[in-house]
From Swiss-Prot:
Family (UniProt): Belongs to the GlnD family.
Uridylyl-removing as annotated region, ranges: 342-704
Residue ranges constituting the HD domain according to the UniProt record: 460-582
Domain-related comment: Has four distinct domains: an N-terminal nucleotidyltransferase (NT) domain responsible for UTase activity, a central HD domain that encodes UR activity, and two C-terminal ACT domains that seem to have a role in glutamine sensing.
Catalytic activity: [protein-PII]-L-tyrosine + UTP = [protein-PII]-uridylyl-L-tyrosine + diphosphate; [protein-PII]-uridylyl-L-tyrosine + H2O = [protein-PII]-L-tyrosine + UMP + H(+)
Organism: Pseudomonas syringae pv. tomato (strain ATCC BAA-871 / DC3000)
SUPFAM superfamilies linked to this entry: ACT-like, HD-domain/PDEase-like, Nucleotidyltransferase, Nucleotidyltransferase substrate binding subunit/domain
SMART domains: HDc (SM00471)
Record protein name field: Bifunctional uridylyltransferase/uridylyl-removing enzyme
Regulation: Uridylyltransferase (UTase) activity is inhibited by glutamine, while glutamine activates uridylyl-removing (UR) activity.
Domain ACT: 705-788, 815-891
Gene that produces this protein: glnD
Region span, Uridylyltransferase: 1-341
Amino acid sequence: MPQVDPDLFDRGQFQAELALKASPIAAFKKAIRRARDVLDNRFRSGRDIRRLIEDRAWFVDNILQQAWDQFEWSEDADIALLAVGGYGRGELHPYSDIDLLILLESDDHEVFREPIERFLTLLWDIGLEVGQSVRSVDECAQEGRADLTVITNLMESRTIAGPEHLRQRMLEVTSTQHMWPSKEFFLAKHAEQKKRHHKYNDTEYNLEPNVKGSPGGLRDIQTILWVARRQYGTLNLHALAGEGFLLGSENALLASSQEFLWKVRYALHMLAGRSEDRLLFDYQVRIAGLLGYEDNDAKLAIERFMQKYYRVVMSIAELSDLIIQHFEEVILSDDDGTPQPINSRFQLHDGYIEATNPNVFRRTPFAMLEIFVLMAQHPEIKGVRADTIRLLREHRHLINDDFRNDIRNTSLFIELFKCEIGIHRNLRRMNRYGILGLYLPEFGHIVGQMQHDLFHIYTVDAHTLNLIKHLRKLQYTEVSEKFPLASKIMARLPKPELIYLAGLYHDIGKGRGGDHSELGAVDAQAFGTRHHLPAWDNRLIVWLVSNHLVMSTTAQRKDLSDPQVIHDFAQFVGDEVHLDYLYVLTVADINATNPTLWNSWRASLLRQLYTETKRALRRGLENPVDREEQIRRTQTAALDILVRSGTDPDDVEQLWSALGDDYFLRHTAGDVAWHSDAILQQPADGGPLVLIKETTQREFEGGTQIFIYAPDQHDFFAVTVAAMDQLNLNIHDARIITSSSQFTLDTYIVLDHEGGSIGNNPERIQDIRDGLTEALRNPDDYPTIIKRRVPRQLKHFAFAPQVTIHNDAQRPVTVLELLAPDRPGLLARIGKIFLEFDLSLQNAKIATLGERVEDVFFITDANNQPLSDPQLCSQLQEAIVKQLSVNSEPGGDLRISI
């Protein structure tokens, strides 16, 4: 800490100002404001961050000493003011906790009660937010023995004012001889760390990470130092290196990583104007700018900054694992035991694998891959011994092109993917220890690569490893219940290693600019060649990487009731083997991207596409189902259901004669029978008919189907979606049919706000039925579009809406594709615009992906014809962009082809 820094705090000048004022508060506040400005300017000008946080601690020391001196304490008073915790370490960020301990010799606090209260009141009056405790030396011992947090704080203390001997006595009575011996302390701190990591999903890669508490954050470094302090009396990283527990390179890496996180935390506090350790979207862009990051052709400044952040915390996590493992071996091991040989290079020691000698990786570099294969083959191995982790770090520079092309290494890498268990766990270890990104440089490129959106909640490497984890979990019984079809297919794949390898490469082309699927396919081709994969295997992997988005896009954006869509997709996949692999990869990809993306309706769409495509492949691509055949088959099956329930076939025929072909193409026989039975029983003046049921009885799949039958009216769709918005229903699919008798038969698939169907909830179902019926009885009383607050996170991903309009080549409709920021009530607003433009909606595919929506609307004009006026299309686009540009960028993108 500085001894003198008059620009930050001039003691003489401050005391002179105190003497001129009746109250000291103004002088203190002025000094605090000035110091904050000085320190912020120093930060912006690039001052060394370690000096900066020490400067702030030094300034607060001086302020506290001056405040302490405002009160009369006798020279021999047994009372002292101590800094504890982070402040005790001499580290203070702009709004860090200022933790104080007022330490007394005696348990009797009464004699000092009044001056202590006045001292603390002064601190609050001058704007210092302090956390304080008042304890005697004996009370410190009692509290420290009972509370891990208290003993941790007391270990880091400095005397600010008063006699030093009180602190020394406190340290003596709270030492390991009296409480918290190093073994007990280590176990408690390690458990505390695991609990903290679990709070942040056990990943360094959260979208809005906590720079202090997340895995790889500042708290992990502090945990290392706390354990070292309790075991060895070591004060800092440099001292820990001096004791031989850290190599010089490891110390340098931890120190530089700590300083980077200090910069981020300092900037966070400065921008937030409060204690804020969450790297929220609100601050990420500005911090990237403060730290000097700029956009380039391939990446935004924020993506470059966050990639640096993720790589830093990954390095900290790696070293933290190593050091904690070392502490565990030293502190907890009661008996070294006799190592059990695995082979000439590795042995098992206390359940952990270790190299048999320090030269293993130098003499046999292939052992750097072999160790992970051995752990996959022997799941009883708990992990890697600390010294062997260190040896891996020291020798990983040997991974070069010769290493990558060595047949022993390529064979070992493929062997890992053929292991029945442990693939994900050991790929994650390889990534943690820096081996995976060196062996596959293309993977190294995506380590820490974020995507600035809410759709992808993990970095590319974390998402990739999560995908492999999901593939592996499909073989677990508890997971197979949620994903029955994917689990069944996964179990019968002829070569499961190929799906794992495709998963490893599916997003590897991201962050370079260009189409990541095409770039990844090139890398996958090179990988297969280098690893001597059979030609068919390699072609399948490359095909999967190149086309890994196609099935998801088809299911969510195409009309799966159209036989031509199924036929085209069946032609695309070509055979059932490709279909099986692509389906499983798609399911795992969606779940590994963002758990909230996988909902029951997406599950149903993918199952439907898979099942219909499989049926088409078995029938033969040369024998596609035509429209007439599908209509005839649906009508025959539906009529059979109705007749068996006692319905008059003549009544059915009369009803169906007005419905048109599209109705029977877009509904199942079961739904047609359900609709027809209810319509035929509906009184002539019964008002709107609203039917509600689940689309499937399969758990974890489907949605809630709402069928509405009523006389057609101009504003029917707009009124319906506005009413559903009021009912807090998320629309995921809309099928709009108008009969020749001018009745509308609309089917909506809805989910609740948690992504599930309404289920067996009679009260909720009745509320929905009543709400829709009332709205449709009084269409002129247009439901108010609820003005809901746009969620905080969505505000930071605004972009200009994009509208594409073109006429369908096969059907007499106009296709309007919308890509826009998500916002509450979006579909209700679109419905109102369609009403204003006198447009009819024939069909809709609704998809919300993170912070954006990708919706497709099939529309016609007032005469049920495709749009033909370019000027009308332009006006429609402008209206949509204007309506949806609130809280997003102005402008918009229009593409019209009519």
